[in-house]
Each structure stands twice: as C-alpha cells, then as structure tokens.
C-alpha cells in the first residue's frame, strides 16, 4: 500500500505522538501530508499545532484547523443526552461521542483535498481505532487507512523519543503537563495510564484537572434552573446561549461544586478491561435534569421503553457505530419521544451532588395532582382498583386452582 498513497490526511493534535506520526508518514510512505486539527473544546491553544506542522514541512494550504464546538454539542452531545445514554451504568461516553465528528470531518477534508488516505494516532489496543475507522469508511469507503501503531516498531516510549530526537522533533515537556494519558473535549476529560493501570490504586488528587474536590467545594449550595425544548437544553437561569456556550456554563458550575468525577473499570470493545478516570461536570448535571423533565412529560410505557433501549444505544456509541442504520433508527424513536420534553428543572448543586428540587412544564406535563392526591378524591374512584387487580391476578388465580404453588 505504501507506493499507492500519494496524499494522506492526518488527525493531528500538535503533540509529540502525532508529530512523530507526521514525520513517519513522510518517511515511510513518501507522501504529501495534510494535517487536520479539530477544536471540540479541549481547552488548548490550537495555533501551536499550526506552527508545529509548518516546522515539520507541511504546506500552509495543507493545514486545516476547524472549530467544531457548536456542531459537536448540537449534533452529537445533545442527541445522545436525549437518550440518557450511559455505558455500563456509569460512563457518559465523553470520548466515544467525539470520534464520529472528527472522523467525518477528516474524511470530508480528504475528499476536498484529493487525498487517497487518512491516518490517526489511536493504538491497536483501544476503542478509538474502531471508532475512527468506522467513521472514515462510512463516509468514504475507498479511502486507505494508515494506523501507525499497528504498523511501526516504535512500540515503547524510549523508541518514540529516540525517533523524535533523530528527526529534530521537539520533545520538551510543557510546564504543568500531566503525566497521564488524557483526552479532553467540551463534554469531559479522561485519564489513563501510570498508577491507574492498577485498579486497586486510588488516583492522586492532583490528577483531576478540572473540578474542585467535593471536600473543597463551596459550603453553600447553589440553585440553578435549566430550560429544555424538545429534550435539548436551551437556557441556564433564563440565559439563552449557543449549544457550546450552554455546556461550557454547565461545566463551570459543575467544576465549582465538585460534580462529575468518575473512576471505573470498563469493558473495551476489543475485549479487554480498562480502568479510566473521568470528569464530566456539565454532562452529569444535564443528565439529571433531563431525566427529571422526562418524569413529568413522558408517558409511562414510552419512558420504560426508552430505558430498555438505552443500553443498546449507549453500546453502539461506545463501540463506534454512530453512523450505523441501527443507531439512526433508535435516534428517530428517541427524538419522537422528545416532542413533549419541554419545561424547566430546578437543581441544587452541593459538594459533588446534583439534587432535583423542582420540575415543571406549562403545556406538556402529565402530572395531575387531582389523580394522585392524598386528600379527598374528586376525579379518581378508588373502587375501580379492585377490578384492575383481579384481572391482573387472573393467571395466578387459575394456576392456583390448578394446584400450582408459587
């Protein structure tokens, strides 16, 4: 394949690993390299990535830096939260949901520039290789895919550093840079590696980059109100912001109050178990609020069906199948359920906790106090329950008369 590749688009962060990949592609494939850097809210200056690419011989016209923050939240994060998606009961899918957008945009740049290949920096052990490559192939089945970690012999940190030094790639460590393997976007930040590879070892407090420790969070709680339209967040405390602005604001609130830390061992799609630590402050608040709104606006059976389908939906995202027909089918069903998910939720934030203290919907609430009051009945006849119970118990009655024991 090496002689067949003339131009490749590399998902490029400007960091050491992808800079080594850039040089390796030039040397091993003798091809033209186009770099693509996505801004999905990782909180880093992206101009250094441009300068780094230029220093490694990339032409100015072959450097693409795109601000995808609003698209990421509007078209990926919000649809996922309409489903209340959680993987294995805990993980809010912060890394998983970012990969489809990066892959799609990278494939589009490949088509735009006439490239015949794409490349990524995901290892051969993880889920990201699957997520990226399923995304590439969904948009351009003819693209060749170069996954250096599955090809090269630079299989240790020492070999990588030696290669970088040999080719004049700066290997100086940024001041304050974490030693952990991290991935960040507007929804979360993740940590892997080092002491975290022992699931019995507690993470150090200074590992957490975003949020206050709940112990150090303010001693006074904070009450906020979130407004929703068709299942999507549209305002915080009455202030309407862009999708990215809303999630940024929620992150600030969550970090301030020590909300959204998570330490889990998850089952990777490739078959192994992996320990990861995550901070998802805004997403944790958003999920709590959305479920509270659905509690008054969704029909019982519709809500229960959503809950049954959610694990499948979450697994599809985790495993990289965002662009699959089955995910789109589920999304259509989920979006239909959100037509009446309109209203306001009041929350109290305090030392790592998100507590729902109110929910209302002017036109779409199915909560009717007249039916569930403990005071004198006016619209509900309690005697009706006797027949309801007897009909539901009929199979037990018949089985009992047949001599069956339970």
From Swiss-Prot:
Pathway: Amino-acid biosynthesis; L-arginine biosynthesis; L-arginine from L-ornithine and carbamoyl phosphate: step 2/3. The keyword Ligase applies. It is an enzyme of class 6 (ligase). Belongs to the argininosuccinate synthase family. Type 1 subfamily. GO terms for biological process: argininosuccinate metabolic process; L-arginine biosynthetic process; urea cycle. It is found in: Cytoplasm. Its main location: cytoplasm. The gene is argG. ATP binds at residues 11-19, 38, 121. The lineage of its organism: Bacteria, Pseudomonadati, Campylobacterota, Epsilonproteobacteria, Campylobacterales. It comes from the Bacteria. Its EC number is 6.3.4.5. Keywords: Amino-acid biosynthesis, Arginine biosynthesis, ATP-binding, Cytoplasm, Ligase, Nucleotide-binding. It catalyses: L-citrulline + L-aspartate + ATP = 2-(N(omega)-L-arginino)succinate + AMP + diphosphate + H(+). It comes from Campylobacter jejuni subsp. jejuni serotype O:2 (strain ATCC 700819 / NCTC 11168). L-citrulline binds at residues 91, 96, 127, 131, 181, 190, 266, 278. NCBIfam families: argG (TIGR00032), PRK00509.1 (NF001770). One of its GO terms (molecular function) is ATP binding. This is Argininosuccinate synthase. Pfam families: Arginosuc_syn_C, Arginosuc_synth. PROSITE patterns: ARGININOSUCCIN_SYN_1, ARGININOSUCCIN_SYN_2. L-aspartate binds at residues 123, 127-128. GO terms for cellular component: cytoplasm. Homotetramer. Signal peptide: none annotated.
């Amino acid at each position: 394949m090496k002689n067949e590749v003339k131009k490749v688009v590399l998902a490029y962060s400007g960091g050491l690993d992808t800079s080594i990949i850039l040089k390796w592609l030039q040397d091993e494939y003798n091809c033209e390299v186009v770099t693509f850097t996505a801004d999905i809210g990782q909180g880093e200056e992206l101009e250094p990535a441009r300068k780094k690419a230029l220093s490694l011989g990339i032409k100015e016209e072959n450097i693409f830096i795109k601000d995808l923050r609003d698209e990421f939240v509007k078209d990926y994060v919000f649809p996922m939260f309409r489903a209340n998606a959680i993987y294995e009961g805990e993980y809010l899918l912060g890394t998983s949901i970012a990969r489809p957008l990066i892959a799609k945009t990278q494939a589009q740049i490949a088509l735009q520039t006439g490239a015949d290949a794409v490349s990524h920096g995901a290892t051969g052990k993880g889920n990201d290789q699957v997520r990226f490559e399923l995304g590439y192939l969904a948009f351009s089945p003819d693209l060749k895919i170069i996954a250096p970690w599955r090809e090269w012999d630079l299989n240790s940190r020492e070999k990588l550093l030696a290669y970088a030094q040999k080719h004049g790639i700066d290997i100086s460590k940024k001041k304050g840079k974490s030693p952990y393997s991290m991935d960040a976007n507007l929804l979360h930040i993740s940590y892997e590696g080092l002491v975290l590879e022992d699931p019995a070892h507690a993470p150090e407090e200074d590992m957490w980059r975003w949020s206050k420790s709940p112990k150090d969070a303010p001693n006074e709680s904070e009450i906020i109100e979130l407004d929703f339209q068709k299942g999507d967040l549209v305002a915080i405390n009455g202030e309407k912001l862009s999708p990215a602005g809303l999630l940024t604001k929620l992150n600030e609130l969550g970090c301030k109050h020590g909300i959204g830390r998570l330490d889990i061992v998850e089952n990777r799609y490739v078959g192994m178990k992996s320990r990861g630590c995550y901070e998802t402050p805004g997403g944790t608040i958003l999920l709590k609020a959305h479920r509270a709104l659905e509690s008054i606006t969704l029909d019982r059976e519709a809500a229960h069906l959503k809950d049954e389908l959610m694990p499948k939906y979450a697994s599809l995202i985790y495993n990289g199948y965002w662009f699959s027909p089955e995910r789109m089918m589920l999304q259509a069903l989920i979006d239909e359920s959100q037509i009446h998910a309109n209203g306001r939720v009041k929350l109290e934030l305090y030392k790592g906790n998100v507590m729902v203290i109110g929910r209302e919907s002017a036109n779409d609430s199915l909560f009717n106090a007249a039916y569930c009051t403990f005071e004198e009945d006016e619209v509900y006849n309690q005697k009706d329950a006797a027949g309801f119970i007897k009909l539901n118990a009929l199979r037990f009655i018949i089985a009992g008369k047949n001599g069956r024991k339970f």
